[in-house]
Protein backbone atom coordinates (compact mmCIF):
# COMPACT_ATOMS: atom_id res chain seq x y z
CA UNK A 1 0.00 0.00 0.00
CA UNK A 2 1.46 3.36 -0.98
CA UNK A 3 -1.32 5.68 0.17
CA UNK A 4 1.08 8.00 1.91
CA UNK A 5 4.37 7.31 0.20
CA UNK A 6 6.35 10.42 -0.63
CA UNK A 7 5.66 12.28 -3.84
CA UNK A 8 8.51 14.51 -5.04
CA UNK A 9 7.56 18.10 -4.41
CA UNK A 10 9.98 20.77 -5.54
CA UNK A 11 9.87 24.27 -6.90
CA UNK A 12 13.24 23.98 -8.62
CA UNK A 13 12.28 21.78 -11.56
CA UNK A 14 12.45 22.89 -15.16
CA UNK A 15 8.69 23.51 -15.33
CA UNK A 16 9.08 26.16 -12.67
CA UNK A 17 12.44 27.52 -13.76
CA UNK A 18 11.21 28.13 -17.29
CA UNK A 19 8.51 30.43 -15.98
CA UNK A 20 10.68 32.50 -13.69
CA UNK A 21 11.49 35.98 -14.93
CA UNK A 22 15.18 36.45 -15.84
CA UNK A 23 17.23 39.36 -14.60
CA UNK A 24 16.38 42.59 -16.33
CA UNK A 25 18.64 44.19 -18.92
CA UNK A 26 20.07 46.55 -16.29
CA UNK A 27 21.49 43.59 -14.37
CA UNK A 28 19.19 44.07 -11.38
CA UNK A 29 17.22 41.49 -9.47
CA UNK A 30 14.12 40.13 -11.25
CA UNK A 31 10.67 40.96 -9.92
CA UNK A 32 9.39 38.49 -7.36
CA UNK A 33 7.08 35.72 -8.60
CA UNK A 34 4.24 34.46 -6.43
CA UNK A 35 3.94 30.69 -6.00
CA UNK A 36 0.53 29.35 -5.01
CA UNK A 37 -0.18 25.78 -3.93
CA UNK A 38 -3.05 23.87 -2.36
CA UNK A 39 -1.79 21.96 0.65
CA UNK A 40 -2.88 18.40 1.40
CA UNK A 41 -2.66 18.10 5.20
CA UNK A 42 -2.93 14.32 4.88
CA UNK A 43 0.13 14.18 2.66
CA UNK A 44 2.06 16.62 4.84
CA UNK A 45 1.32 14.91 8.14
CA UNK A 46 1.79 11.39 6.76
CA UNK A 47 5.27 12.32 5.51
CA UNK A 48 6.08 13.78 8.92
CA UNK A 49 4.88 10.54 10.53
CA UNK A 50 7.11 8.51 8.21
CA UNK A 51 10.11 10.67 9.09
CA UNK A 52 9.62 10.27 12.84
CA UNK A 53 8.95 6.56 12.24
CA UNK A 54 12.33 6.21 10.51
CA UNK A 55 14.14 8.28 13.14
CA UNK A 56 12.60 6.20 15.92
CA UNK A 57 13.93 3.03 14.31
CA UNK A 58 17.42 4.50 13.89
CA UNK A 59 17.48 5.73 17.50
CA UNK A 60 16.41 2.42 19.06
CA UNK A 61 19.92 0.97 19.31
CA UNK A 62 21.20 4.14 21.02
CA UNK A 63 18.37 5.03 23.39
CA UNK A 64 15.06 3.27 23.93
CA UNK A 65 13.59 6.31 25.67
CA UNK A 66 14.48 8.61 22.77
CA UNK A 67 13.21 6.06 20.28
CA UNK A 68 9.92 5.83 22.18
CA UNK A 69 9.60 9.61 22.25
CA UNK A 70 9.93 9.73 18.47
CA UNK A 71 7.50 6.82 18.17
CA UNK A 72 4.85 8.69 20.14
CA UNK A 73 5.22 11.71 17.88
CA UNK A 74 4.92 9.49 14.82
CA UNK A 75 1.77 7.77 16.05
CA UNK A 76 0.08 11.09 16.77
CA UNK A 77 0.94 12.27 13.26
CA UNK A 78 -0.36 9.06 11.67
CA UNK A 79 -3.68 9.55 13.47
CA UNK A 80 -3.80 13.25 12.58
CA UNK A 81 -3.20 12.39 8.92
CA UNK A 82 -6.11 9.93 9.05
CA UNK A 83 -8.38 12.64 10.42
CA UNK A 84 -7.22 15.09 7.78
CA UNK A 85 -7.83 12.54 5.03
CA UNK A 86 -11.48 11.90 5.82
CA UNK A 87 -12.36 15.51 6.58
CA UNK A 88 -10.76 16.65 3.31
CA UNK A 89 -12.55 13.87 1.44
CA UNK A 90 -15.87 14.97 2.90
CA UNK A 91 -15.34 18.50 1.59
CA UNK A 92 -13.95 17.44 -1.80
CA UNK A 93 -16.37 14.60 -2.52
CA UNK A 94 -19.36 14.97 -0.21
CA UNK A 95 -22.81 16.34 -0.87
CA UNK A 96 -22.92 20.01 0.08
CA UNK A 97 -25.99 19.53 2.27
CA UNK A 98 -24.30 16.78 4.30
CA UNK A 99 -20.68 17.89 4.57
CA UNK A 100 -21.17 19.80 7.82
CA UNK A 101 -22.32 16.61 9.52
CA UNK A 102 -18.74 15.34 9.64
CA UNK A 103 -16.48 18.25 8.64
CA UNK A 104 -17.56 21.00 11.01
CA UNK A 105 -14.71 21.72 13.47
CA UNK A 106 -17.17 23.43 15.81
CA UNK A 107 -19.03 20.11 16.21
CA UNK A 108 -16.38 17.41 15.86
CA UNK A 109 -17.43 13.77 15.72
CA UNK A 110 -15.31 10.86 16.94
CA UNK A 111 -12.94 9.92 14.13
CA UNK A 112 -14.27 6.38 13.79
CA UNK A 113 -17.79 7.79 13.35
CA UNK A 114 -16.58 10.00 10.51
CA UNK A 115 -15.12 6.96 8.75
CA UNK A 116 -18.49 5.24 9.13
CA UNK A 117 -20.49 8.18 7.77
CA UNK A 118 -18.25 9.22 4.89
CA UNK A 119 -19.73 6.83 2.26
CA UNK A 120 -23.22 8.15 2.96
CA UNK A 121 -22.02 11.76 2.81
CA UNK A 122 -20.27 11.14 -0.50
CA UNK A 123 -23.48 9.55 -1.76
CA UNK A 124 -21.99 6.95 -4.04
CA UNK A 125 -20.05 3.74 -3.82
CA UNK A 126 -20.79 0.07 -3.97
CA UNK A 127 -22.54 0.12 -0.59
CA UNK A 128 -23.74 2.87 1.74
CA UNK A 129 -22.39 1.14 4.84
CA UNK A 130 -19.16 -0.47 6.00
CA UNK A 131 -18.90 -3.68 7.99
CA UNK A 132 -16.92 -2.35 10.94
CA UNK A 133 -16.69 -5.78 12.52
CA UNK A 134 -14.33 -6.90 9.74
CA UNK A 135 -10.61 -6.14 9.50
CA UNK A 136 -9.09 -3.53 9.45
CA UNK A 137 -11.76 -1.60 11.34
CA UNK A 138 -11.43 -3.17 14.82
CA UNK A 139 -7.68 -2.60 14.52
CA UNK A 140 -8.22 0.99 13.40
CA UNK A 141 -10.52 1.52 16.38
CA UNK A 142 -7.69 0.40 18.68
CA UNK A 143 -5.21 2.83 17.10
CA UNK A 144 -7.69 5.65 17.65
CA UNK A 145 -8.46 4.43 21.17
CA UNK A 146 -4.76 4.55 22.05
CA UNK A 147 -4.48 8.16 20.94
CA UNK A 148 -7.69 8.99 22.83
CA UNK A 149 -6.29 7.42 26.00
CA UNK A 150 -3.43 9.91 25.83
CA UNK A 151 -5.64 12.96 25.36
CA UNK A 152 -8.41 11.80 27.74
CA UNK A 153 -6.32 10.00 30.37
CA UNK A 154 -9.03 8.95 32.80
CA UNK A 155 -8.66 8.11 36.52
CA UNK A 156 -5.41 6.75 38.02
CA UNK A 157 -6.44 3.11 37.76
CA UNK A 158 -6.79 3.52 33.99
CA UNK A 159 -3.28 5.00 33.71
CA UNK A 160 -1.35 2.24 35.40
CA UNK A 161 1.74 0.93 33.62
CA UNK A 162 3.66 -2.21 34.51
CA UNK A 163 7.38 -2.97 34.24
CA UNK A 164 9.65 -5.92 34.89
CA UNK A 165 13.11 -5.93 36.47
CA UNK A 166 15.30 -9.03 36.59
CA UNK A 167 16.56 -8.07 40.05
CA UNK A 168 16.32 -5.26 42.57
CA UNK A 169 18.10 -2.17 41.33
CA UNK A 170 18.37 -3.44 37.77
CA UNK A 171 17.01 -1.60 34.77
CA UNK A 172 13.40 -2.34 33.99
CA UNK A 173 11.45 -2.95 30.81
CA UNK A 174 7.75 -2.78 29.92
CA UNK A 175 5.93 -5.88 31.13
CA UNK A 176 4.64 -8.07 28.32
CA UNK A 177 1.46 -10.14 28.72
CA UNK A 178 3.28 -13.49 28.83
CA UNK A 179 5.62 -12.17 31.54
CA UNK A 180 2.90 -11.29 34.05
CA UNK A 181 2.94 -13.65 37.07
CA UNK A 182 -0.15 -15.82 37.22
CA UNK A 183 -1.10 -14.62 40.69
CA UNK A 184 -0.54 -10.93 39.92
CA UNK A 185 -4.06 -10.23 38.74
CA UNK A 186 -2.67 -8.30 35.78
CA UNK A 187 -4.85 -8.98 32.77
CA UNK A 188 -3.27 -9.00 29.28
CA UNK A 189 -5.70 -6.33 28.07
CA UNK A 190 -4.39 -4.02 30.81
CA UNK A 191 -1.03 -4.09 29.05
CA UNK A 192 -1.83 -4.15 25.34
CA UNK A 193 -4.74 -3.80 22.97
CA UNK A 194 -5.83 -7.33 22.02
CA UNK A 195 -6.06 -7.04 18.22
CA UNK A 196 -3.02 -4.87 17.44
CA UNK A 197 -0.76 -5.55 20.41
CA UNK A 198 -0.22 -1.81 20.81
CA UNK A 199 0.90 -1.00 24.36
CA UNK A 200 -1.39 1.02 26.60
CA UNK A 201 1.67 2.54 28.26
CA UNK A 202 2.92 5.38 26.01
CA UNK A 203 6.50 4.87 27.26
CA UNK A 204 6.39 1.30 25.94
CA UNK A 205 5.77 2.33 22.33
CA UNK A 206 8.51 1.11 19.96
CA UNK A 207 9.17 1.29 16.20
CA UNK A 208 7.57 -2.09 15.51
CA UNK A 209 4.33 -0.73 16.95
CA UNK A 210 4.53 2.02 14.34
CA UNK A 211 4.84 -0.65 11.65
CA UNK A 212 1.53 -2.02 12.93
CA UNK A 213 -0.04 1.44 13.08
CA UNK A 214 0.96 2.32 9.55
CA UNK A 215 -0.27 -1.02 8.24
CA UNK A 216 -3.64 -0.53 9.93
CA UNK A 217 -4.00 3.02 8.58
CA UNK A 218 -3.06 2.02 5.04
CA UNK A 219 -5.47 -0.91 5.23
CA UNK A 220 -8.27 1.39 6.36
CA UNK A 221 -7.56 3.77 3.48
CA UNK A 222 -7.68 0.89 1.00
CA UNK A 223 -10.93 -0.45 2.46
CA UNK A 224 -12.61 2.95 2.43
CA UNK A 225 -11.38 3.62 -1.09
CA UNK A 226 -12.95 0.37 -2.29
CA UNK A 227 -16.22 1.37 -0.65
CA UNK A 228 -16.09 4.66 -2.56
CA UNK A 229 -15.28 2.97 -5.88
CA UNK A 230 -11.79 4.47 -5.90
CA UNK A 231 -12.89 8.09 -5.46
CA UNK A 232 -10.83 8.58 -2.30
CA UNK A 233 -7.43 8.17 -3.98
CA UNK A 234 -8.23 8.56 -7.67
CA UNK A 235 -5.52 10.53 -9.49
CA UNK A 236 -3.73 10.89 -6.14
CA UNK A 237 -6.45 13.32 -5.07
CA UNK A 238 -5.65 12.79 -1.39
CA UNK A 239 -1.96 13.65 -1.86
CA UNK A 240 -2.01 16.10 -4.73
CA UNK A 241 -0.59 19.58 -4.08
CA UNK A 242 -0.88 21.52 -7.35
CA UNK A 243 1.42 24.48 -7.88
CA UNK A 244 0.82 27.65 -9.85
CA UNK A 245 3.39 30.32 -10.66
CA UNK A 246 2.12 33.87 -10.96
CA UNK A 247 4.78 35.76 -12.88
CA UNK A 248 5.01 39.50 -12.29
CA UNK A 249 3.57 41.88 -14.81
CA UNK A 250 6.30 43.77 -16.71
Can you say where each PLM-predicted feature lies in the sequence?
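Polyanionic, low-complexity intrinsically disordered segments
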Residues: 29-42, 47, 155-250
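Charged, amphipathic alpha-helical oligomerization/scaffolding segments
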Residues: 48, 77, 81, 138-149, ...
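Surface-exposed polar/charged interaction patches
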Residues: 52-55, 59-62, 92, 96, ...
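A structural signal for well-ordered alpha-helices, especially hydrophobic packing surfaces
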Residues: 53-56, 60, 85-86, 147-154, ...
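Short, hydrophobic, well-ordered secondary-structure elements
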Residues: 67-93
